[in-house]
Curated annotation (Swiss-Prot):
NCBIfam families: arch_bud32, PRK14879.1-3, PRK14879.1-4, PRK14879.1-7. Its main location: cytoplasm. GO terms for biological process: tRNA threonylcarbamoyladenosine modification. InterPro entries: Bud32, Kinase-like_dom_sf, Prot_kinase_dom, RIO_dom, Tyr_kinase_AS. The lineage of its organism: Archaea, Methanobacteriati, Methanobacteriota, Thermococci, Thermococcales. This is KEOPS complex subunit Bud32. GO terms for cellular component: cytosol; EKC/KEOPS complex. The gene is bud32. It comes from Pyrococcus abyssi (strain GE5 / Orsay).
Amino acid sequence: MKLIKQGAEAKIYLAEFSELYFDYPIKVIVKERIKKRYRIPEIDLKLRKERTIREARILRRAKEFGVNVPYVFEVDTKNMIIVMEYIEGERLKELLEKLPMEERLKVCREVGRQIGKLHEAGIVHGDLTTSNMILREGKVYFIDFGLAEFDDTIEAQGVDLHLLKRAMESTHYKWFERGFEEVLKGYIEIRGEDKGREIREKIREIELRGRYRERSWITQ
């Protein structure tokens, strides 16, 4: 088992399935939520357990709604561990920049469809960036649901998409407007025109709020 990432909340390990269970030729991700020494131990334990269970439930519900996410093999609430499928492929962050424009836009539309299904399930990802999306065998997969929540409000869904737009503007700045428009078209294919208009209006509203705050800060 190899440590591949350590964040503020969790350690991420890559392991062979056979290391944990029985002989089977696949790899798995082992996500361990780490203790916070600054927290009261009882509160820390409660929070880590709640977040471990919530993430596993979110992944299960997302899959039920047809979202491409890792399959969960095990949830260990004693050690705060989730064992899940390793999605082997190429991150969209790098892949999109190598594809011809027509192919990029097709992938972006599929990203939108996947987000639409996720929001239909009453889930917001909380960290939608092309770094958390992987293309495997022609399918777009979402990973890293550590910040995800059960939330079906238009505000939360608008924030989810707004964060993706900002991330695309930063990473894919030369063509992000065309790309994000395709994301919205894919989203509308799943959720319908009425919800599409509602989400576009919410994204504009969120952007205006952000600009107002920036102007207020500058004039202070």
